[in-house]
Every structure is written in structure tokens, then in C-alpha cells.
Amino acid sequence: MSLRTNLIFWLLTLLVLVGAIVSISERSEVIEEVSLQKVFKDLEDRLQDVHQISIKNRENAIDLSRKNKEWVLTDRNNFIASEEVVKGLLLAVSELKLKESKTSREELLPRLHVEDVSKKDSKSILLVLRDQKNKVIAELIIGKEAEQMAGVTGMGRYVRKPDEKTAWLAEGNIEVFLDVNKWVNPK
């Protein structure tokens, strides 16, 4: 190879390498920005305002209310609920972070279990947090758990806000129970 051909080869190689580095760094910045966004930006500051929790799927529902500093199952004769389980749920919801946009196509939402709860064969769960005046603080459709997710917690769920079309992979460990026994205070 001549000196000129060799020089052109190395310049092209250098340009391709620089282009690849720039492309990768731009992509990682976008992913970082999204992953830093919380699903509900101000929820952590408003947790004390939550007075009602409603959880439902196509077949079951759990309703909780805060009465005299205790959480009760309003649909179960105001039976006292486990403070630990309620606080765990509220904290988990407030810490959920958007990791990656998944789909906006309505026909794909059932695969992630984030379709409308009222639809036939729906496997999604609707979580609604309300204040003392019955005003919605946060509302989220919670889908299936993500498998083998990388990240700080290694845990994730597919989620979608009911008024939005886009389903997201959210980072965080959120367990939503529709079994009354999981909510009962063991005392």
C-alpha cells in the first residue's frame, strides 16, 4: 500500500471511530435523562395528602382510607389495614422512575398488561391516590413485571398513565395487592 492510501485508510478509520463515540455518548445522555424522571414528580412531597387509595383490576377492588391517623379497608367495614404495607406502596409509587418508553400502539398494550382495566380479559391494575377532598393526586395503570431489568434496583414494571397513550418501563419495586389478606393489620 502506498503512503497516500495508508493515510486515507487511517483517516477514515478515525472518522468512523469518532462518529461511533459521539453517537453512543448522545444515546446514553438521552437514556439517563429519561431514567432520572420520576413517574410522579411531586408525589413524594404530597404523600401526607393521600387520604384514599383505590386499587382495582377487572374483577376485584380494594379501597383504603385514612381515618384518625389509621388506614382502614373501607370496603371491608373499616377493618384496620397494615400501616407498613400502605406506607410501602405509597413510597414505592413515589420512587418509580421512567426507564424507557415502550409503545404507544393500543394493540400492544395488553402484552405489557397496561390496557384499560375495564377491557375484556384485561390483566392490568389501576391505582388511584386521592386527597381528603377526593381530588386525584396520582393515577397509574400498573402492568406486568419486567424480567431481568438492569438498574439500581434490578426491578421494574410496565406502567401507563390512564390519560396517556404511551406505556413505559418503570424502574422500582412496586407490589400492588388485590388480596385483602395482604392488607390486614396482623395485630
Annotate the PLM regions.
Residues 1-187:
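Soluble, acidic/polar mature domains that operate outside membranes
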